[in-house]
Amino acid sequence: MFAQLSTLQPILGGELSNSAATSVADIDEVMPRMARLGLNTVLVPAYWELMEPTEGHFDFTLIDRTISRAREQGLKVVFLWFGAWKNSMSCYAPAWFKQDVRRFPRAMNAGGKQLEIASCFSDNVLRADLKAFSALMRHLSELDPRCETVVMMQVENEIGMLESARDHSPLAEKAYKAERWAELHGTGDQSDEQFMAKYYARYVESWRRPPAR
C-alpha cells in the first residue's frame, strides 16, 4: 500500500490484528508501541458491533480514543470498517443484526444450510450496514474535518464467500435466474465467484448514494 500523507511523506504503516483495538486499554497500549516501531500510520479496525451495540444508538468511544492517542504519538490512522463482513463472515456485526435472521438473511450453500455470512442480496443488510458506516463518516468529518489524522478508510474487509462459491439463498437465486447466469456464463466455481464478485461490488458501489436518514 502506498499513499501520500499531508506532509507528502510515504506511508510507513502497521496493521493491528483483528481484535487488538476492542477497548480503550488496548488502544492506550498499542499506539505508543506503534510509534516506537518507527511507523507513521496505523491501520485500525472500526468494529460495527462495538459502535452500534443497540440499533440506532452509536458509541464512538473507541474511534475517538484511537484518534486522540494517534495524535499524541504523531501517527496517522487508516480505519478498516469491520461491518457486515470481515474475512467473509459476519462475525463483527452487532448482536441485534446477527440474531434477526428473518430481517437480515444469511447466505446459504447449495444444500440450503445457512452460513454465518449476511447475504449481500438483502436490502435490509445493505441499509443497516450503510447507516452505521455513514454515521461513522459523519462523526469523522466533525472530529477530523481536514483529514489531518484519518487519511484513509477501508470499506469492509476481505468480503467473499467461504464454504460455498456463491450464495444460494432465495434472494440470491432470484438474481441468478433473472440474469440467466448459468446460460450466459456457464457453471462451476469460477462462474459462481464471478457472480458473487459482481454483486458484492454492486453492494459497495451503491454506497455512493447517500442513505435516507
Each language-model region and where it sits:
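Structural preference for beta-strand elements that scaffold enzyme active sites
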Residues: 11-13, 41-43, 74-78, 148-154
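Glycine-rich anion/phosphate-binding loops
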Residues: 22-27, 58-62, 126-134
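Polysaccharide-binding and catalytic clefts of secreted carbohydrate-active enzymes
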Residues: 93, 100-213
